[in-house]
């Protein structure tokens, strides 16, 4: 059975004229063009440019329309041979999981699909900031709903920094509500979250880069500490924040030149962050020692060996932690706690942790 119709996903890049020649060809030859806006504010210059270049109507659609997808797929399947439908979006179309799911549905219906790739904020962030692309790790979106307490963002950033990797934070913008997360709001949210977890992931002195409206004529780049950036105004969205991990000297030189700041102010943030075990093991060791001290006077001499082994495990935990052997440190604390608990299970003494 032959395929029925075509669904072409066209990336528009980062702004006006960011679409490739191939993308323009697909837009011009389409029967229907849907232009998707839901994470980036409407940009009149882009709309004007596309209307001029393709000479046909653009149908602006939102997130719900694309997620539902039925109208798009129905349009592609109309007529004996189907129609050519283009879904255009800023950035690269396959960065959005919604598009990938729609593509799979189209293929199952016998609709031919094609993807025209383009630049994204994720790729442009490295080029714009002067950081090495391969050193970026998991990218995170900061949403309006969670900006007050950024637990998931905090933990992902923590893991990235432990690896010495850079982190890209994409700040959400809801085109329907006309609201988004500003860089100062995201920074304030991270600092509030640090107060809860206290792992040294971020502080007022954390060095970061703010990238606003990349790919546009009014693009803005800023660098500084959280304390400095939290006081700045960054204008219209979209915005993103880069928090560097370990910096190669060539990255430091590039950041200094691009952002126009003294090289001595450019710094990575990985050295300041505490490993999870560095936070937990000292607390567990101290607590276990307090409990041991409280029950020791109640124990008969025959349990001296148990007490001695508890102390040995606690010292092992501290030594393993100092040598970066976090898993063994956690296990050693667990063994120490288990020995003390065994005294309770045996009915020797009652212990209140």
Label the model's feature ranges.
Residues 304-308, 327-334:
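Short, charged, amphipathic alpha-helical segments
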Residues 304, 337-353:
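Short, charge-rich amphipathic alpha-helical segments embedded
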Residues 269-308:
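Amphipathic, heptad-repeat alpha-helical segments
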Residues 2-10, 113, 120-268:
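Beta-strand/loop-alpha-helix module characteristic of Rossmann-like adenine-cofactor folds
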Residues 1-112:
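Class I S-adenosyl-L-methionine
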């Amino acid at each position: 059975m032959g395929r029925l119709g075509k669904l072409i996903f066209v990336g528009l890049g980062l702004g006006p004229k960011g679409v490739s020649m191939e993308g323009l060809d697909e837009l011009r030859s389409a029967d229907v063009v849907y232009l998707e806006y839901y994470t980036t504010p409407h940009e009149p210059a882009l709309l004007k440019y596309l209307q001029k270049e393709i000479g046909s109507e653009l149908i602006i659609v939102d997130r719900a329309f694309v997620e539902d997808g039925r109208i798009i797929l129905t349009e592609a399947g109309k007529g004996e041979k189907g129609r050519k439908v283009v879904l255009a979006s800023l950035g690269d179309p396959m960065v959005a999981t919604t598009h990938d799911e729609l593509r799979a549905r189209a293929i199952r219906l016998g609709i031919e699909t094609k993807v025209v790739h383009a630049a994204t904020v994720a790729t442009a962030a490295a080029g714009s900031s002067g950081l090495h692309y391969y050193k970026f790790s998991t990218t995170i979106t900061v949403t309006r709903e969670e900006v007050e307490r950024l637990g998931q963002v905090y933990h992902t950033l923590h893991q990235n920094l432990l690896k010495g990797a850079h982190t890209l934070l994409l700040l959400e913008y809801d085109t329907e509500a006309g609201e988004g997360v500003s860089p100062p709001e995201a920074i304030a949210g991270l600092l509030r979250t640090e107060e809860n977890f206290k792992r040294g992931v971020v502080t007022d002195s954390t060095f970061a880069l703010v990238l606003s409206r990349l790919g546009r004529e009014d693009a803005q780049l800023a660098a500084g500490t959280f304390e400095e950036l939290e006081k700045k105004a960054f204008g219209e969205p979209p915005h993103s924040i880069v928090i560097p991990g370990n910096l190669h000297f060539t990255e430091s030189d590039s950041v200094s030149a691009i952002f126009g700041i003294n090289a001595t102010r450019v710094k990575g943030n990985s050295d300041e962050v505490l490993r999870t075990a560095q936070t937990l093991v000292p607390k567990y060791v101290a607590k276990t020692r307090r409990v041991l001290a409280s029950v020791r006077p109640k124990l008969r001499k025959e349990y001296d060996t148990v007490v001695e082994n508890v102390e040995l495990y606690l010292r092992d935990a501290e030594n393993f932690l100092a040598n970066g052997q976090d898993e063994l440190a956690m296990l050693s604390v667990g063994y120490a706690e288990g020995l003390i608990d065994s005294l309770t299970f045996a009915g020797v003494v009652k212990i209140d942790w």
